[in-house]
């Protein structure tokens, strides 16, 4: 059965800014997309916490630092300037997950497995601020299924934000709300993407798995 789509006809996606901009963010997952999303948020002036899993042994930040280094060395460049890169703070899920309680926007960009994403969002709900926007960067999984088991309040602040690779250069941000996503959350993300990230905005319907 297809999930009922949010009626987007009343949304003000291209109006002048009517929502506060994001100042801080956390990106969970430091693969190619996660690290470069973090880079472009830093380009827009945000303080960004980039987190990934800790390996079984050795430096607990080895995985996240590898992803961050790849973003800093990317060609074409992911960061506008070296100063922008200094706004990204790396960490790991074991030691630093509570940092997401400090941010305005939490973006999950872990591997495309439903079970892993659900586990991550359960942890996000435990630590995120009650007013934080929470999104997933999935390109293929149903957004509403990722949020299964979460509270109604969480679901109102949750949506899909599909960046295209490389995020700095591809000028499109696909926003995928669920039936439960609050319209003002969609508007806020769309306005920020358009005004601060330089994105054209497409609002897409969530689909069944």
Question: What function would you assign to each model-found segment?
Answer:
Residues 2-14, 47-104, 114-115, 119:
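Conserved N-terminal Rossmann-fold NAD(P) cofactor-binding segment
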Residues 19-24, 85, 103, 131:
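Phosphate-coordination loops involved in phosphoryl transfer and adenosine-cofactor binding
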Residues 24-27, 48:
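Conserved hydrophobic helix-helix packing surfaces used for dimerization/oligomerization
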Residues 30-31:
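Glycine-rich Rossmann-fold phosphate-binding loop(s) that bind the pyrophosphate
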Residues 34-35:
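N-terminal Rossmann-fold NAD(P) dinucleotide-binding loop
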Residues 38, 42-43:
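Gly/Ala-rich phosphate-binding loop of Rossmann-like dinucleotide-binding domains
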Residues 113-193:
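Rossmann-fold NAD(P)-binding glycine/threonine-rich loop
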Residues 169-176, 195-209:
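Conserved Rossmann-fold dehydrogenase catalytic segment
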